[in-house]
Protein backbone atom coordinates (compact mmCIF):
# COMPACT_ATOMS: atom_id res chain seq x y z
CA UNK A 1 0.00 0.00 0.00
CA UNK A 2 2.69 2.50 1.04
CA UNK A 3 4.80 1.56 -1.97
CA UNK A 4 2.25 2.58 -4.58
CA UNK A 5 3.10 6.29 -4.70
CA UNK A 6 6.92 5.87 -4.85
CA UNK A 7 6.47 3.19 -7.52
CA UNK A 8 4.21 5.47 -9.56
CA UNK A 9 6.56 8.44 -9.20
CA UNK A 10 9.47 6.21 -10.17
CA UNK A 11 7.68 5.17 -13.35
CA UNK A 12 6.85 8.76 -14.26
CA UNK A 13 10.46 9.92 -13.81
CA UNK A 14 11.80 6.99 -15.79
CA UNK A 15 9.31 7.71 -18.56
CA UNK A 16 10.27 11.40 -18.68
CA UNK A 17 13.97 10.61 -18.84
CA UNK A 18 13.57 8.07 -21.62
CA UNK A 19 11.15 10.30 -23.53
CA UNK A 20 13.61 13.20 -23.55
CA UNK A 21 16.47 11.00 -24.73
CA UNK A 22 14.33 9.48 -27.48
CA UNK A 23 12.92 12.79 -28.72
CA UNK A 24 15.83 15.18 -28.13
CA UNK A 25 18.78 12.86 -28.54
CA UNK A 26 22.00 12.90 -26.57
CA UNK A 27 22.40 16.65 -26.07
CA UNK A 28 23.96 18.21 -22.97
CA UNK A 29 20.52 19.25 -21.73
CA UNK A 30 18.91 15.93 -22.64
CA UNK A 31 21.59 13.86 -20.94
CA UNK A 32 21.62 15.96 -17.77
CA UNK A 33 17.81 15.84 -17.58
CA UNK A 34 17.79 12.09 -18.15
CA UNK A 35 20.43 11.54 -15.46
CA UNK A 36 18.24 13.53 -13.06
CA UNK A 37 15.16 11.51 -14.02
CA UNK A 38 16.83 8.09 -13.92
CA UNK A 39 18.47 8.84 -10.57
CA UNK A 40 15.11 9.95 -9.17
CA UNK A 41 13.36 6.92 -10.66
CA UNK A 42 15.75 4.39 -9.17
CA UNK A 43 15.72 6.14 -5.77
CA UNK A 44 11.90 6.15 -5.66
CA UNK A 45 11.80 2.60 -6.97
CA UNK A 46 14.21 1.50 -4.25
CA UNK A 47 12.01 3.13 -1.60
CA UNK A 48 8.95 1.38 -3.05
CA UNK A 49 10.71 -1.96 -2.53
CA UNK A 50 12.09 -0.89 0.87
CA UNK A 51 8.60 -0.28 2.22
CA UNK A 52 7.71 -3.90 1.39
CA UNK A 53 10.65 -5.82 2.88
CA UNK A 54 10.67 -7.43 6.31
CA UNK A 55 14.31 -8.53 6.48
CA UNK A 56 16.65 -6.04 8.25
CA UNK A 57 19.68 -7.09 6.15
CA UNK A 58 17.78 -6.46 2.92
CA UNK A 59 16.46 -3.19 4.35
CA UNK A 60 19.93 -1.83 5.13
CA UNK A 61 21.13 -2.80 1.63
CA UNK A 62 18.17 -0.99 0.03
CA UNK A 63 18.64 2.03 2.30
CA UNK A 64 22.30 2.37 1.35
CA UNK A 65 21.56 1.85 -2.36
CA UNK A 66 18.69 4.36 -2.25
CA UNK A 67 20.78 6.91 -0.41
CA UNK A 68 23.61 6.42 -2.88
CA UNK A 69 21.22 7.79 -5.50
CA UNK A 70 19.90 10.55 -3.21
CA UNK A 71 23.45 11.83 -2.73
CA UNK A 72 23.67 12.73 -6.42
CA UNK A 73 20.18 14.22 -6.86
CA UNK A 74 20.98 17.83 -5.85
CA UNK A 75 24.04 17.85 -8.10
CA UNK A 76 22.18 16.33 -11.03
CA UNK A 77 19.51 19.03 -10.66
CA UNK A 78 22.24 21.69 -10.51
CA UNK A 79 23.87 20.12 -13.58
CA UNK A 80 20.58 20.21 -15.50
CA UNK A 81 19.87 23.82 -14.53
CA UNK A 82 23.42 24.79 -15.52
CA UNK A 83 22.88 23.27 -18.96
CA UNK A 84 19.41 24.84 -19.38
CA UNK A 85 20.90 28.20 -18.43
CA UNK A 86 23.78 27.71 -20.88
CA UNK A 87 26.37 28.46 -18.20
CA UNK A 88 29.49 26.47 -19.17
CA UNK A 89 31.52 28.52 -16.68
CA UNK A 90 29.52 26.78 -13.90
CA UNK A 91 30.66 23.31 -14.91
CA UNK A 92 33.69 23.28 -12.61
CA UNK A 93 31.31 23.88 -9.68
CA UNK A 94 29.05 21.09 -10.92
CA UNK A 95 32.04 18.74 -11.03
CA UNK A 96 33.09 19.88 -7.55
CA UNK A 97 29.61 19.05 -6.30
CA UNK A 98 29.76 15.62 -7.95
CA UNK A 99 33.11 15.16 -6.18
CA UNK A 100 31.63 16.00 -2.77
CA UNK A 101 28.74 13.61 -3.43
CA UNK A 102 31.28 10.92 -4.35
CA UNK A 103 33.19 11.44 -1.10
CA UNK A 104 29.95 11.18 0.87
CA UNK A 105 29.15 8.02 -1.11
CA UNK A 106 32.39 6.45 0.12
CA UNK A 107 31.36 7.20 3.71
CA UNK A 108 27.86 5.88 3.02
CA UNK A 109 29.12 2.57 1.67
CA UNK A 110 32.05 2.10 4.03
CA UNK A 111 30.73 3.28 7.38
CA UNK A 112 27.74 4.27 9.48
CA UNK A 113 28.74 7.95 9.46
CA UNK A 114 26.25 8.95 6.78
CA UNK A 115 23.37 6.56 7.46
CA UNK A 116 23.46 5.03 10.93
CA UNK A 117 20.89 2.30 10.65
CA UNK A 118 17.17 2.63 10.23
CA UNK A 119 13.89 3.29 11.93
CA UNK A 120 11.15 0.71 11.75
CA UNK A 121 7.71 2.23 11.22
CA UNK A 122 4.32 0.68 10.57
CA UNK A 123 4.80 1.40 6.85
CA UNK A 124 8.33 -0.01 6.65
CA UNK A 125 11.97 0.78 7.25
CA UNK A 126 13.37 4.29 6.88
CA UNK A 127 16.99 5.53 7.09
CA UNK A 128 18.44 7.08 10.23
CA UNK A 129 20.73 10.04 9.53
CA UNK A 130 24.34 9.75 10.63
CA UNK A 131 26.85 12.38 11.71
CA UNK A 132 27.81 13.37 8.14
CA UNK A 133 24.24 13.76 6.91
CA UNK A 134 24.14 17.54 7.62
CA UNK A 135 26.92 17.99 5.03
CA UNK A 136 24.59 16.56 2.39
CA UNK A 137 21.75 18.81 3.57
CA UNK A 138 24.03 21.85 3.32
CA UNK A 139 25.23 20.77 -0.13
CA UNK A 140 21.61 20.37 -1.22
CA UNK A 141 20.68 23.85 -0.03
CA UNK A 142 23.71 25.43 -1.70
CA UNK A 143 23.58 23.72 -5.11
CA UNK A 144 19.79 23.83 -5.53
CA UNK A 145 19.69 27.52 -4.65
CA UNK A 146 22.64 28.20 -6.95
CA UNK A 147 20.94 26.31 -9.78
CA UNK A 148 17.68 28.17 -9.30
CA UNK A 149 19.52 31.50 -9.09
CA UNK A 150 21.47 31.03 -12.33
CA UNK A 151 18.32 29.83 -14.08
CA UNK A 152 16.41 32.86 -12.85
CA UNK A 153 19.21 35.23 -13.91
CA UNK A 154 19.49 33.59 -17.32
CA UNK A 155 15.74 33.87 -17.85
CA UNK A 156 15.76 37.49 -16.73
CA UNK A 157 18.54 38.42 -19.14
CA UNK A 158 17.49 36.19 -22.04
CA UNK A 159 15.87 37.18 -25.27
CA UNK A 160 12.11 36.42 -25.02
CA UNK A 161 12.40 33.47 -27.43
CA UNK A 162 15.10 31.85 -25.26
CA UNK A 163 13.60 32.66 -21.86
CA UNK A 164 10.80 30.13 -22.16
CA UNK A 165 13.20 27.18 -21.71
CA UNK A 166 14.47 28.54 -18.40
CA UNK A 167 11.01 29.43 -17.17
CA UNK A 168 9.66 25.97 -17.96
CA UNK A 169 12.57 24.36 -16.07
CA UNK A 170 11.93 26.27 -12.83
CA UNK A 171 8.44 25.00 -11.85
CA UNK A 172 9.54 21.40 -12.32
CA UNK A 173 11.60 21.76 -9.15
Show which residues each predicted segment covers.
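Individual alpha-helical transmembrane segments in multi-pass integral membrane proteins
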Residues: 1-14, 24-146, 170-173
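Structural signal for the C-terminal ends of transmembrane alpha-helices
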Residues: 18-25, 82-86, 152-159
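Hydrophobic, aromatic-rich transmembrane alpha-helices
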Residues: 144-154
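Membrane-helix boundary/juxtamembrane motif in polytopic membrane proteins
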Residues: 153-173
Amino acid sequence: MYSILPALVSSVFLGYGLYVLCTQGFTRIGISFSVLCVTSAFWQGTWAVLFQVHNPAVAIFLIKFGYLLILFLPTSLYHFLTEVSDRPQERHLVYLSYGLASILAVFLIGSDLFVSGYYEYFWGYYPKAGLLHPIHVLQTVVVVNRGLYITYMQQRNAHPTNASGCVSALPAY
